[in-house]
């Protein structure tokens, strides 16, 4: 056993020696190639080592650069917002100037030419500033539509100016006025009253004038011409007057010749159907006749021929009579 192990060790060592020799023989001519292969790698390795050494500094520089860019972007944004707010304030100022009568100042700044970019604005804001900004001029209030001539003169409706102390009519339907330093002094004259039948009034003059009068009357739902007479009832007669009013009169009935007059539907005054008569107590006595009311009393109705005069009460006389 010891001899076999020794032999095995010797064989192993001899094989190892041979292997080493072969390796040395094979590797000896490749030394310059390895050097040449390692030569270009060394600068790259040095660069990597240099980059690894310089990387913290560069990272810090990049961090600072990014922070600077972020801060500069914020500065651009803040400056842009300030520029936008400045333009809004400027537009409000222009509107205020226009409302105060300084429309000329606002008109000078309505258009901003190209290239007039505010300093420090970001590119987006610069593009907005370079573009033409058309600002509409606000309309002036009504009180500024015409110049104020108070203390200098007076103006009529057509815009004509009159000097102080001059008489003029402010409008086509206005009365004459006197121009004073305090303004027009107008006095309304006393105008005549219009006709009650006037149906068309002309107000183009200082005093209104009647241009047309109605030539008819209206009465109880009917229309009548001027000066026309008409009968409303058997006892009423009416007339359309020139002033448009209707005047009516009631017929005056004469005294009846009887004590029992009768009214007929188509007649205004009563008539005596029984002729002239009078009363003897409750009895009716015809005129001119005697009537015996009882055995001892005779009554007659007084009547004068041609005059139709009668007494209401009959004349009665009582005679002596025999009692049966």
UniProtKB/Swiss-Prot annotation:
Biological function: BMP antagonist which may play a role in neural development. Promotes cell adhesion.
Signal sequence, start to end: 1-27
Tissue: Predominantly expressed in the brain (at protein level). It is expressed in the neurons but not the glial cells.
Lineage: Eukaryota, Metazoa, Chordata, Craniata, Vertebrata
Domain VWFC: 152-211, 215-273
Source organism of this protein record: Mus musculus (Mouse)
Motif (Mediates cell adhesion): 114-116
Keywords: Basement membrane, Extracellular matrix, Repeat, Secreted, Signal, Synapse
Stretch list, region Disordered: 37-126
Annotated protein name in UniProt: Brorin
């Amino acid at each position: 056993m010891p001899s076999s192990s020794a032999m095995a060790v010797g064989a192993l060592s001899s094989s190892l020696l041979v292997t080493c020799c072969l390796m040395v023989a094979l590797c000896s001519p490749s030394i310059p190639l390895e050097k040449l292969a390692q030569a270009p790698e060394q600068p790259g390795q040095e660069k990597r080592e240099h980059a690894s050494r310089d990387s913290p500094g560069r990272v810090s520089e990049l961090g600072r650069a990014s922070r600077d860019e972020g801060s500069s972007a914020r500065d651009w944004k803040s400056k842009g917002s300030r520029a936008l707010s400045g333009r809004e304030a400027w537009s409000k100022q222009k509107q205020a100037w226009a409302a105060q009568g300084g429309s000329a100042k606002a008109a000078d700044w309505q258009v901003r030419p190209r290239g007039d970019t505010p300093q420090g604005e970001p590119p987006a804001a610069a593009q907005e500033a370079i573009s033409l900004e058309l600002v509409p001029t606000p309309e002036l209030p009504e009180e500024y539509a015409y110049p104020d001539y108070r203390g200098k003169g007076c103006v009529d409706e057509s815009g004509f100016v009159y000097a102080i102390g001059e008489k003029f009519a402010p409008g086509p339907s206005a009365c004459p006025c006197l121009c004073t330093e305090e303004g027009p002094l107008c006095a309304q004259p006393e105008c005549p009253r219009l006709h009650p039948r006037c149906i068309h009034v002309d107000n183009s003059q200082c005093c209104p004038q009647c241009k047309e009068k109605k030539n008819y009357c209206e009465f109880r739902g009917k229309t009548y011409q001027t000066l026309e007479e008409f009968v409303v009832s058997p006892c009423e007669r009416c007339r359309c007057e020139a002033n448009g009013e209707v005047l009516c009169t009631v017929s005056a009935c004469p005294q009846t010749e009887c004590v029992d007059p009768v009214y007929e539907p188509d007649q205004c005054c009563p008539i005596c159907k029984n002729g002239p008569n009078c009363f003897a107590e409750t009895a009716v006595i015809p005129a001119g006749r005697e009537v015996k009311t009882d055995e001892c009393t005779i009554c007659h109705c007084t009547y004068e021929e041609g005059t139709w005069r009668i007494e209401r009460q009959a004349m009665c006389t009582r005679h002596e009579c025999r009692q049966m």
